Regions:
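Conserved beta-strand scaffold positions in the cores of enzyme catalytic domains, especially
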Residues: 33, 108-110, 221-224
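Residues in the short beta-alpha loop(s) of Rossmann-like NAD(P)-binding domains
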Residues: 36-39, 202-204, 228
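Conserved catalytic-core segment of NTP-binding enzymes
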Residues: 19, 26-27, 125-224, 232-233
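Walker A/P-loop phosphate-binding motif and the immediately C-terminal alpha-helix
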Residues: 2-36
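C-terminal boundary of histidine-terminating zinc-finger modules
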Residues: 235-245
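N-terminal phosphate/diphosphate-binding loop that engages ATP/GTP or pyrophosphate donors
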Residues: 23-106
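Phosphate-binding/switch loop-helix module in NTP-utilizing enzymes
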Residues: 79-152
Length: 257
């Protein structure tokens, strides 16, 4: 199963992704987390692993990877491995991913499509195109799950990355923007025939009813995460998330049923 985790900036995508990944691993699933946000440098810390090498480096970096995708026949002339050539046209398994491009701990693998490391290096289009190819050709066994921690917003829908996933999980925080975005993401998910699920995050007694009423108009709410002081502190300090939270366990059970 391949699942997109999306939402507005700051809604808690990486936090929920991390907690879900760890819970699914405890359920004896083999989990792959794909860091799809070129500006996020904290997901690996939440998982308690080193930041993996940018996957674009496997294809010689952003410039060479771009030429590979845009120029017909260049694959035959480039010094790429068999997997790199197969990547653009054939299906592959989680076990085929080169081990130097992921970090791993306690049954969870983390890989990164790429990061912006310096000014004027160019946009993230190449990284996003490679991500689209990766998701399209990745095949998973029954006991394997991939969680795609997307960048904020809806651009991944425009690129077509979500065409190859099995479901969309949107994280909704208590903000007007997030509530409005839930309607848009529901429409986009429906338009490509993908199920849409929602996780309410940072919920308090004051916000619970309004969030529930608004979001439930657009799809099933499968998780309700209360505002949590310990999670907030861990996010501030960049420490590994090791807590077990009941709503996360419930969401994990829902996803694998």
């Amino acid at each position: 199963m391949k699942i997109t985790v999306c939402g507005k900036g700051g809604c808690g995508k990486s936090t929920v992704t991390t907690l879900l990944a760890k819970e699914l691993a405890r359920m004896e699933k083999k989990v792959l987390v794909v860091d799809s946000d070129e500006s996020n440098f904290g997901l690996h810390r939440q998982l308690g692993v080193e930041l993996p090498r940018d996957f674009t480096e496997y294809f010689g970096g952003k410039d060479k990877a771009f030429k590979t995708m845009m120029t017909s026949g260049i694959l035959d002339s480039m010094k790429l491995s068999a997997f790199a050539k197969k990547f653009f046209s054939e299906d592959f398994a989680m076990a085929d991913i080169p081990e130097e491009y992921y970090s791993e701990k306690d049954g969870v693998k983390l890989m990164s499509s790429g990061k912006i490391h310096k000014a004027n290096e160019g946009c993230a289009c190449t990284m996003n195109s490679i991500l689209e190819q990766f998701v399209a050709h990745l095949t998973l066994a029954e006991d394997e799950i991939a969680l795609l921690d997307m960048e904020a917003g809806v651009e991944h829908f425009g690129r077509g990355t979500d065409n190859s996933v099995d479901g969309i999980l949107m994280i909704v925080d208590p903000s007007f923007e997030s509530l409005r975005l839930s309607a848009k993401i529901a429409d986009l998910s429906t338009s490509i025939g993908k199920p849409i699920w929602f996780c309410l995050n940072k919920v308090t007694e004051e916000t619970a009813q309004m969030m529930e009423e608004e979001v439930s108009k657009h799809g099933a709410i499968i998780g309700r995460m209360p505002l949590d002081h310990d999670l907030g502190l861990a996010g501030l300090t960049g420490t590994e998330l090791q807590m077990t939270i009941a709503p996360i366990s419930e969401m994990a059970q829902f996803l694998i049923q």
